[in-house]
Amino acid sequence: MRSCVCYTLLLFVFFIWLHVATCSSFSDMDALLKLKESMKGDRAKDDALHDWKFSTSLSAHCFFSGVSCDQELRVVAINVSFVPLFGHVPPEIGELDKLENLTISQNNLTGELPKELAALTSLKHLNISHNVFSGYFPGKIILPMTELEVLDVYDNNFTGSLPEEFVKLEKLKYLKLDGNYFSGSIPESYSEFKSLEFLSLSTNSLSGNIPKSLSKLKTLRILKLGYNNAYEGGIPPEFGTMESLKYLDLSSCNLSGEIPPSLANMRNLDTLFLQMNNLTGTIPSELSDMVSLMSLDLSFNGLTGEIPTRFSQLKNLTLMNFFHNNLRGSVPSFVGELPNLETLQLWENNFSSELPQNLGQNGKFKFFDVTKNHFSGLIPRDLCKSGRLQTFLITDNFFHGPIPNEIANCKSLTKIRASNNYLNGAVPSGIFKLPSVTIIELANNRFNGELPPEISGDSLGILTLSNNLFTGKIPPALKNLRALQTLSLDTNEFLGEIPGEVFDLPMLTVVNISGNNLTGPIPTTFTRCVSLAAVDLSRNMLDGEIPKGMKNLTDLSIFNVSINQISGSVPDEIRFMLSLTTLDLSYNNFIGKVPTGGQFLVFSDKSFAGNPNLCSSHSCPNSSLKKRRGPWSLKSTRVIVMVIALATAAILVAGTEYMRRRRKLKLAMTWKLTGFQRLNLKAEEVVECLKEENIIGKGGAGIVYRGSMRNGSDVAIKRLVGAGSGRNDYGFKAEIETVGKIRHRNIMRLLGYVSNKETNLLLYEYMPNGSLGEWLHGAKGGHLKWEMRYKIAVEAAKGLCYLHHDCSPLIIHRDVKSNNILLDAHFEAHVADFGLAKFLYDLGSSQSMSSIAGSYGYIAPEYAYTLKVDEKSDVYSFGVVLLELIIGRKPVGEFGDGVDIVGWVNKTRLELSQPSDAAVVLAVVDPRLSGYPLISVIYMFNIAMMCVKEVGPTRPTMREVVHMLSNPPHSTTHTHNLINL
């Protein structure tokens, strides 16, 4: 009897368990399906989470993609990264109370986190990084998650103070809060974490002093507090007590003062990044006690003194970046003996003397850059002993002697820059056969001899040998350089004819062979090289006529054959070359009359001077003008009649099309609002603001309205022209995919969009002070004082820097200009208008475009020539904006003869008898400015000229620009530098 009762009881318990398990299983499935419905959003692809479907099977949900269950069929893990999803996290997430791992990163989820997350008390791993979550981070919902070990909220839109509730999570090991908008100081309580091993707070808007109490985090191994924060004071000396720390990143966060010698006590530290701050003083020799150190970056500071000799103890060092400081003295010989050193970058310092000849003997060197110092002597021969050296950069020094054969035969090299030295002798032939090299720059040296007859290299894009003593003929083997874009052989002693094979290169855009002893005609192949953008053959002894077919060169912008012996007539087909802005045919033997009309209207008489038998329309006698006037008038009448007839037909067609589109529009006027954050407004409110009296701007892509919402807020509404989707969406997709996802205080925030089948309306935060262009060139012109101009430059640079260096993939704006830098109520700058933006997946790579985009006067030369765009194209455009801030004039239209602002500045420098930086600035500075610090203007001017260098790779990065602008010389604020006009 007793056994029967026991059996019955067990059976009852089993059925109860089965019922509970069944209910829990179906409950988890229901929760997952509700998650799918909410998180997909309207913009997700149809196949997103396609296998998340209802089933009567108890275990079906355990086989959903990204879902894992325990033995009781309860969901314990969800990983739906990279789907992508565009909705929000619903309250039903709290029903998955057995969840241990929730990873929803790399999506486009928006809104605030639901309070129901607090029910996930078993959660150990929470990753919501790379989304668009906004608002204050709800620290209270984390408190019940007592098992939490990993919390990653990187790259979202969270604002407010750093939550202090995290400190109570005793098992938390990994806390990643960077890439948000957290502000205020780092809480002192953050020193109370019990188990924390990883803490990253970089790329926020933090301020105040770095708490010295963080040194109490004895379990911490990685600490990142840097980029885009703006702390006060310096590095806490107490950090030296963090003996477990292996990685410390305090880069680019406004730190000042000296480097504390006490940091040397961090014996386990392998990475120390202090670059891009305002650190001063000498490099503490005590740092040599950090025997585990592998990467040391002190670049972009104001450090002085010499490299400590005790650094010879750093046997594990692989990276030594000391560039852009005020270091002096010689490079100690022990640097060449560091057994693991791979990267040595010392550029822009005051180092002198000879380099140690043992550099590279460790067989590890990859990157070597000592540009802009005062080094002399011979080039070390063993730099490429490793066979892995990629960059050899020694420009702007005093090196002499030859280029060692060992370097010339280094097949791993990608960049060779040795211009502006005193190098001499023949260039080893091997340097012209390196398979991976992309740049060879040897200009302004004393090299001699002939170029080798055999030249090859599939990667070489820039070959610059200008201003040397090269002789002999230009080798036809240059045709083997199939990737060559820039060929500069000017100011040498080359002779013979120009080999026609040169112009068979498919990517050639810039050719400068001026200032040699070349003879013979211009090769007929010249007019077949349709990629050409700039050609300078001046100051030679060329003869013959200009080959026929010039009009085929549709990208040619500069053509200079002055001071030669070229004859024949000026090609009439030049009139059709709309890209040609600079033409110089002066001092030749041209005959006849200069053609008129078309592109010839752009050129002045200077372009044709010094040709005795050539006359212009002003100097040639009028011939039978009256005889032609009658027939021409009749012809004109016929043309006018035809135009009127065609116009009438066009109006009828347009009217019919208009009525058809109007009928279609009525069917498509269902507006829908999509917000990238919580918006307290409705689509109808936005549409009601599309009135003539609300227009605040017009452009090629659409009209911008000011919208006053019922809640009292103002928004900017950009109504895009054209259809709502498709290939010609006038930047709608580009804006959504770029500014819709990114967040930075100096990038105009896209709040959301309103759309129907015919029209897209983009909603932005309203900028009451308009654009920088309006303040410089409009009715408000001249009211910006220098301090405000400088502030705007720094802030706009930070916005672009974020696009280039903190977005993944990086974003190229492609239309940087003063009209796209908007100013809020406090005159803080915001980069705007991403309708032309493009993603670029590798920094330093380029992307080919089908046509030129951007604004005339701001477009980088290589972009206009090759249609290839990279982040350095934006740098050029920003340099033009800096010149606008200094000069106060538009980039084009004010300098005559197709000259832009960059060309005008260079021309002004050449015209000055003593062209110092100060003289140039005083000659070009905005006359409306008064009381400005001259040194500050000169400083920005020099940065601007770095940005607008003709060759893209020689321009600084936006990160370097930000650092330079943020760290002006102290003397720029001294009152004795003020200029009153």
UniProtKB/Swiss-Prot annotation:
Compartment(s) where it occurs, according to its Swiss-Prot or TrEMBL record: Cell membrane
UniProt domain Protein kinase: residue ranges: 690-973
This protein's superkingdom?
Eukaryota
Source organism of this protein record: Glycine max (Soybean)
List the membrane topology term(s): Single-pass type I membrane protein
Q: Which residues bind ATP?
A: 696-704, 718
EC number(s) in its UniProt entry? 2.7.11.1
Q: What does this protein do?
A: LRR receptor kinase involved in the regulation of plant growth.
Q: Where is the active site?
A: 815 (proton acceptor)
Which protein are we looking at? Leucine-rich repeat receptor-like kinase protein CLV1a
Q: In which tissues is this gene expressed?
A: Expressed in roots, leaves, vegetative shoot apex, and reproductive floral apex.
Q: Which GO terms describe its cellular component?
A: membrane; plasma membrane
**Where do the TM regions start and end?**
639-659
- Gene Ontology biological process terms from the UniProt entry: cell differentiation
Which family is annotated?
Belongs to the protein kinase superfamily. Ser/Thr protein kinase family.
